[in-house]
Regions:
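A short acidic, often aromatic-flanked loop/helix-cap motif at beta-alpha or helix-coil junctions
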Residues: 29-33, 96-97, 166-169
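A generic structural signal for short hydrophobic patches within well-formed alpha-helices
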Residues: 12, 142-144, 177
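Short active-site oxyanion
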Residues: 1-3, 166-167
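Conserved core of the sugar-phosphate nucleotidyltransferase
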Residues: 37-39, 43, 57, 65-154, ...
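Short beta-strand scaffold positions
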Residues: 4-6, 137, 171
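Catalytic donor-sugar/metal-binding loop of nucleotide-sugar-dependent glycosyltransferases
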Residues: 148-169, 174-178, 183-189
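Short internal beta-strands
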Residues: 2-6, 90-91
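Short phosphate-binding loop-to-helix
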Residues: 3, 9-59, 67-71, 75
Length: 192
């Protein structure tokens, strides 16, 4: 099932036109700029549970990460079904060359500077992975019991789902929108 939660009647109509379920208009208190995602998902779960259906898990697709290749969602569902984890998060690989700033103004490398590998030598274990907000799959009980999309509590399990680097855009600034638009145009023109 594809369910859209929105407070906008026009967006609801568009979602329905493309085959999504829009069983309710999201309440105003869950549609503010400061509203977290988890209460919105919990609202939808509660709606469906009260109406006789409780999903085993929820796949969250956020509009700010619109680039997904054909087959990605089916591959994600398959991996989640096979792995037995409580939650799964979409990630893209990034090199290990990450730096942080300390309060004293000094930078610190999150890698061994004197043993810096070439990018071509990196392995699955030496890459870092960036959560990009594109896709999460979470067992329903994690939302309802822990109010989180990831099972980071003691005993909870999380899996990583590798997205193609082209799927890694997260729209936070105007330039990100341009990048996403370009990537989607490219994907559609190539027929991927």
């Amino acid at each position: 099932r594809v369910v859209v939660s929105t407070d906008d009647a026009e967006l609801a109509d568009i979602a329905r036109e493309y085959g999504a379920e829009v069983p309710f208009i999201r309440p105003a208190h869950l549609a503010e700029d400061t509203t977290a995602t988890e209460p919105v998902i919990e609202h939808a779960i509660e709606f469906y549970t009260e109406n006789g259906w409780e999903p085993e898990a929820v796949m969250l697709l956020q509009a700010t990460s619109p680039v997904r290749l054909p087959g990605t969602l089916a591959r994600a569902v398959r991996q989640f079904a096979e792995n037995g984890k409580d939650s799964m998060v979409g990630v893209i690989p990034i090199g290990p060359f990450i730096w942080t700033w300390h309060a004293d103004g000094e930078p610190t490398a999150a890698f061994e500077i004197m043993a810096r590998p070439r990018r071509q030598e990196l392995t699955k274990e030496t890459f870092r992975y960036r959560e990009n907000g594109s896709m999460y799959i979470t067992k329903t009980h994690v939302y309802m019991d822990h109010h989180n999309r990831l099972a980071g509590y003691p005993g909870g399990t999380i899996d990583l789902f590798m997205l193609d680097e082209v799927e890694g855009v997260d729209i936070d600034a105007p330039i990100d929108f341009s990048v996403a638009e370009h990537q989607l145009t490219q994907i559609l023109s190539e027929g991927k």
